């Protein structure tokens, strides 16, 4: 017996795939989140991007999320994702997309540069947390929730914003943003924002 495919479901899958491709999703993510065939996804990708999808495996190491800058970006994305999920505004891949759009709004990339946290990596992060490989831990200094390895001791964790590595401080001194160089300017900007 042949199962008949729903035209409406196929249209929804095509729309979802187009949105994911526009945000930079890799083929493996498209295959996982839609019911479209690999051939149709490749054809759609080529039509939208003008080139075939990149080849290669998905990132599978949790270590990428632990380096200081990647951790800050990943934590920002995941907190937005968690808020959307808990508030019941959306779920599943829709929550990933909305949280990723919020992340891009808050962390705009320089012209010609890709965002530090790619959509596929953000999607992988959600899967790592769901599978118990990563978790959110509260910083004992600022109270912010940050991505850490699972089973991290709950007390004593200090985030990389409160305790940046020395290379972050060196990079900050080279920044063209005055608020990055002169801490008092940053404090004033924070007070005005509050």
UniProtKB/Swiss-Prot annotation:
Zn(2+) binds at residues 139, 142, 159, 162. It is found in: Cytoplasm. It comes from the Bacteria. Its main location: cytoplasm. InterPro entries: FlhC (IPR007944). Its cofactor is Zn(2+). GO terms for molecular function: DNA binding; zinc ion binding. It holds the Pfam family FlhC. GO terms for cellular component: cytoplasm. Keywords: Activator, Bacterial flagellum biogenesis, Cytoplasm, DNA-binding, Metal-binding, Transcription, Transcription regulation, Zinc. GO terms for biological process: bacterial-type flagellum organization; positive regulation of DNA-templated transcription; regulation of bacterial-type flagellum assembly. Heterohexamer composed of two FlhC and four FlhD subunits. Each FlhC binds a FlhD dimer, forming a heterotrimer, and a hexamer assembles by dimerization of two heterotrimers. Belongs to the FlhC family. Functions in complex with FlhD as a master transcriptional regulator that regulates transcription of several flagellar and non-flagellar operons by binding to their promoter region. Activates expression of class 2 flagellar genes, including fliA, which is a flagellum-specific sigma factor that turns on the class 3 genes. Also regulates genes whose products function in a variety of physiological pathways. This is Flagellar transcriptional regulator FlhC. It comes from Serratia marcescens. The gene is flhC.
């Amino acid at each position: 017996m042949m199962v008949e495919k729903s035209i409406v479901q196929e249209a929804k899958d095509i729309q979802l795939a187009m949105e994911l491709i526009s945000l930079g999703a890799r083929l493996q993510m498209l295959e996982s989140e839609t019911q479209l065939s690999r051939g149709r996804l490749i054809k759609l990708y080529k039509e939208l991007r003008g080139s075939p999808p990149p080849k290669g495996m998905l990132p599978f190491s949790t270590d990428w999320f632990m380096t200081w800058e990647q951790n800050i970006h990943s934590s920002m994305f995941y907190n937005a994702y968690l808020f959307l999920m808990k508030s019941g505004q959306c779920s599943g891949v829709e929550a990933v997309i909305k949280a990723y759009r919020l992340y891009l709004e808050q962390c705009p990339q320089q012209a010609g540069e890709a965002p530090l946290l790619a959509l596929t990596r953000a999607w992988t992060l959600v899967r790592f947390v769901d599978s118990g490989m990563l978790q959110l831990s509260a910083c004992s200094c600022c109270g912010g929730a940050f991505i850490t390895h699972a089973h991290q001791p709950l007390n004593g964790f200090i985030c990389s914003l409160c305790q940046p590595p020395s290379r972050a401080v060196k990079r900050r001194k080279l920044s063209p943003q005055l608020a990055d160089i002169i801490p008092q300017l940053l404090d004033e900007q924070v007070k005005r924002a509050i």
